[in-house]
Amino acid sequence: MSTRQLCRRSFLYGIAVFVLGTVSMSGSVRAQEVLKIGVLGVMSGPAASWGLVNKYCAETSAQLYNEQGGFEIGGKKYKIEIVPIDDKNDPKLAVSGAERLTKQEGVHYIIGPNVDTTAASVQPVAEAGGAIYFPYAFQKTLYTPPHGNAVLGMIASYQAGPIIYKYLMDKKGVKSVSFVARNESDPLNQRDEGVQAAKKLGLEIKSSDDTYEPGTTDFFPVMSRVVNKGADLIVLSGVAPADAPLLIKTARELDFKGTLATETAQDIKILNEVAGAAADGFICVGGASTPEIRSDEMEKFADRYKKVAGEWNDEAGTKVYALEIILATLKKAGPEAITNIELFKKTMPDFAMKNPFIKGDKMLKYVGTAYFSQPRQIGVPMVVNEVSDSKFQTLFVGSVE
């Protein structure tokens, strides 16, 4: 063999080794499988903080797991990829978003949507596409047989409402109540549930038919009617974070001296910026993580959340739970459940883990059977807050079984 042939063979061999090495290296880089989790919700407009907190929570948890090499399911670590979509609180956009997640992205687990109308609109898409979704909406039919693909991600208004009303009756002597709601199905449903609960407790209903249209900025006409009814308590049913401070401020400017409350979560920054001192005494459902009960893991999450979102939002204490329980349930169900949600569903009734976000040994599990005839709710702590000196102060902590 000539020297030229020898050199040529050595050169070709070198190329082959390089190519094989490159393929091997790139193969090892690609070896880690990706687990996609969708986040579908309202991320713009008056209710934007509801969906954005879902997104930031999922991204925060994903970062923390991915920095440790991923989340282990069946002996294999998966990189967590969050796929967020803004549905703008529009049922049509929610449907197209759910279709994109299930059909194009191959997602089988979705966090959101945030209200009844969008959650109901994606139900057929989730069921047809083999997806489990975790809405923050309270319509009972979403979670009740024959449906089984939706899991309530928070405390519902009809669970928190009666407890808040009873507390105010016992602690503040409240005897009468008026309700005001935005003229949309979600707030109207919450109002109706609240009226029923108030009646059962023996509260006098001063009024419950006053509503305002989406996009309202002048609340004096509607709140004048409500305040003039003379109730001890005004409930802002299903109020969006951008509307709440305007309603509160208007009520106080109309010289309302009683208590204002809602069964939904709110944003203290928006309350302070718009309502200011008028928000003092306002009662709402809080995030499921008060400073008194936070574990070290929750503190770590909160620190990272601030870097991801720019600031802490009290509601993140509730919405941290969605991705955590999805991953933990998949771990127990096995890797096949990543694409087969029926295995996930079979695991849910007996699933239990130590709650990683609160001190002590309290277990985290799926609850809600008393309301939905099946366990289709994350068992997050129920925290009720009162605004005091521009901060949320915890009134009490409860739970739903």
Locate the predicted segments by residue:
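Extracytosolic ligand-binding ectodomains
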Residues: S2, C7, F11-I15, G21, ...
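N-terminal signal peptide c-region/cleavage motif recognized by signal peptidases
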Residues: S24-S26
